[in-house]
């Protein structure tokens, strides 16, 4: 197990001993903050907390930084061809730009390199215990937290440490949302979730059914069009497929100009519909149903190639499956198809197995946390979740400002307790607020945010916390 050199000293040097509420021994880490996960959100949490004067212990179950972007990790959802769908300027951290000579949409290997250089530049690895998983996070007296860890895989003894605060940054794109189709267990072909997809060679020469029309599903359908003997693409509803470039610029940069000009949502929707009409035309002629929603009412699907392969007959759109048979799949329109391989690109669900779900406002039946700013839990002022957002553009800047806000909140609890109390009251009153226009009610959109609206909300919270 690789641990931080800063934490290599003995408990007697670095901690005092206490007891948990049920009598277990615990090492008290004083004012140190615990960060769970060393992906993009965890790394920026470490940086911002240390820059505000806090000690940090970060626990990472894998052997390196990068989280979802580290393809070597068994929980990483990336596959060989994964690229950003948000452009470089909107994805980079505000205080650590990506190289100017990188492409508009960097490859996942470049993203991992970027995060590794970020960790190196800010000397973050010395705060990380690698190969260590968190098994329990429990409230302790005085708004503190008892965090129990062990070596990844369950080897060795458990260890409990007490922290002044906790940042959860374990990601929300690693636990597959698995479908429950009738007869699936009887299917004699191969079936897998997109989390197990890595390389187009898995599709080569096969009859492939891709289920799901998110960005991953569209990417895999395109690769099946290139490699498989036949590809069906099943979707529950039709979507609007946005090109990656409009007027020669990445589409999110065009969108940002409209947002900066405060163009009304209805006008932006009209402009997007006009753009799609001029660029890809009416997709119903390829066999797709007309979408039952307007642009901006679902998470953006950004793919310039799917329409190309629909038009060339290499992808056949079909409705959602309703039942699996041993050698065929029955579709909602009554047709049957005979895929050899089914790939379920049905998304992911958040998991916080180490924490009582009620702490995050979930009653345990839905699995959806109820937080303010998608980060702060009512009645738990020293707990934050970083990166639990699904933005319409880049993610890293949002995690950066989330963790800046949390660091300043922790500092205010000492220097300006009245402001901190006002913040805590706002968390209780405003938990569950949304930061996007009307979107479809589905688990896919639980954490949907418009990046401009969300950044403005974070800026207002920072201003209110620090105003004189």
Question: What residue ranges belong to the model's regions?
Answer:
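Short, mixed-charge aromatic SLiMs
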Residues: 425-439
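Active-site segment of extracytoplasmic enzymes that catalyze sulfate/phosphate-ester chemistry
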Residues: 90-91
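Flavin (primarily FAD) cofactor-binding/catalytic cores of flavoenzymes
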Residues: 2-9, 15-84, 97-245, 249, ...
């Amino acid at each position: 197990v690789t641990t931080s050199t800063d934490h290599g000293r003995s408990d007697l040097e670095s901690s005092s001993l206490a007891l948990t509420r049920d009598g277990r021994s615990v090492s008290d880490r004083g004012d140190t903050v615990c960060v769970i996960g060393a992906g993009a959100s965890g790394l920026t949490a470490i940086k911002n907390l240390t820059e505000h004067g806090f000690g940090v212990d970060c626990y990472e179950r894998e052997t390196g930084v990068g989280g979802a972007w580290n393809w070597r990790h068994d929980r990483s959802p990336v596959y060989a061809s994964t690229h950003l769908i948000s452009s470089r300027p909107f994805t980079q951290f505000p205080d650590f730009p990506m190289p100017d000579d990188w492409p508009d949409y960097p490859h996942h290997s470049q993203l991992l390199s970027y995060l590794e250089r970020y960790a190196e530049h800010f000397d973050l690895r010395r705060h990380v215990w690698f190969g260590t998983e968190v098994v329990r996070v429990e409230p302790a007296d005085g708004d503190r937290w008892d965090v129990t860890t062990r070596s990844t895989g369950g080897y060795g003894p458990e260890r409990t440490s007490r922290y002044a605060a906790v940042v959860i940054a374990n990601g929300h794109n690693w636990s597959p949302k698995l479908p429950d189709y009738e007869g699936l267990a009887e299917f004699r072909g191969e079936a897998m979730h997109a989390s197990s997809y890595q390389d187009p060679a898995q599709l080569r020469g096969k009859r492939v059914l891709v289920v799901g029309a998110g960005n991953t599903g569209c990417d895999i359908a395109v690769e099946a069009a290139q490699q498989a003997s036949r590809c069906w693409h099943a979707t529950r509803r039709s979507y609007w497929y946005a090109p990656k470039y409009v007027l020669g610029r990445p589409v999110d940069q065009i969108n940002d100009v409209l947002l900066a000009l405060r163009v009304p949502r209805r006008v932006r929707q009209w402009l997007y519909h006009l753009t799609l009409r001029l660029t890809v035309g009416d997709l119903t002629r390829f066999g797709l149903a007309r979408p039952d929603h307007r642009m901006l009412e679902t998470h953006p699907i950004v793919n310039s190639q799917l329409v190309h392969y629909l038009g060339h007959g290499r992808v056949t759109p079909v409705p959602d499956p309703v039942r699996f048979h041993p050698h065929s799949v029955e579709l909602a329109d009554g047709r049957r198809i005979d895929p050899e391989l089914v790939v379920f690109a049905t998304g992911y669900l958040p998991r916080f197995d180490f924490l009582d779900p009620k702490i995050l406002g979930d009653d345990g039946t839905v699995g959806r946390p109820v937080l303010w700013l998608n980060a702060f839990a009512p009645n738990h002022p020293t707990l934050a979740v970083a990166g639990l957002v699904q933005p319409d553009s880049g993610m890293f800047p949002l995690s950066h400002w989330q963790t800046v806000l949390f660091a300043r909140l922790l500092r205010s609890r000492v220097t300006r307790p009245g402001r901190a109390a006002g913040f805590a009251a706002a968390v209780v009153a405003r938990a569950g607020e949304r930061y996007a226009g009307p979107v479809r009610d589905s688990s896919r959109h639980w954490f949907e945010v418009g990046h401009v609206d969300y950044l403005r909300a974070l800026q207002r919270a920072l201003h209110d916390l620090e105003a004189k």
